[in-house]
Amino acid sequence: MISSNDFRTGTTIEIDGQVWRVVEFLHVKPGKGSAFVRTKLKSVRNGNVVEKTFRAGESVQQAVLEKSNLQHTYVESGDYVFMDMTSFEETRLSSDQIGRGSKYLKEGMEVNVIFYKDKVLEVELPISITLKVTETDPGVKGDTASGGTKPAILETGAQVMVPLFISVGEMIKVDTRNDSYLGREN
């Protein structure tokens, strides 16, 4: 249990069976009445943000999350198989459990998996990854002057918008948080 007075940004708590991360908190002492803590909570499972007010000193169940560094080894019948780099145990996750990041996974990639009570809550990919362009329209000389973009399909099947001068076979850096092109990889 944790007191609402001890909330800090990043603290994880459990309310009604759901795990929430404290995004913002403000301890308020009104001139009249008792003190309270106003918080902004983000659901770890789906990313929803809600505002909730707690009485000062109110006890809340703290959620202790476990973070494991796992390596993606292969895909078998729709499940992504990961290996724990310390215990060498295998963990199988569906694309639903991984979320939108599944389109960036390739063999050998290391990810952080967050567990709560032995259930997967979240899969954290690296912020930027380098992937090969496998399909895109050919670039024409002089295209860079307009500053436009075109769709490109990467080796994992993900689609991102890239500048017109990018061609098939080039290695590019991609931001996994918002699917944006970051630059060429040398």
Swiss-Prot record:
Pathway: Protein biosynthesis; polypeptide chain elongation. GO terms for biological process: peptide biosynthetic process. Its main location: cytoplasm. SMART domains: EFP, Elong-fact-P_C. It is found in: Cytoplasm. Involved in peptide bond synthesis. Stimulates efficient translation and peptide-bond synthesis on native or reconstituted 70S ribosomes in vitro. Probably functions indirectly by altering the affinity of the ribosome for aminoacyl-tRNA, thus increasing their reactivity as acceptors for peptidyl transferase. NCBIfam families: efp, PRK00529.1. PANTHER family: ELONGATION FACTOR P, ELONGATION FACTOR P (EF-P) FAMILY PROTEIN. HAMAP family: EF_P. This is Elongation factor P. It comes from Prochlorococcus marinus (strain MIT 9515).
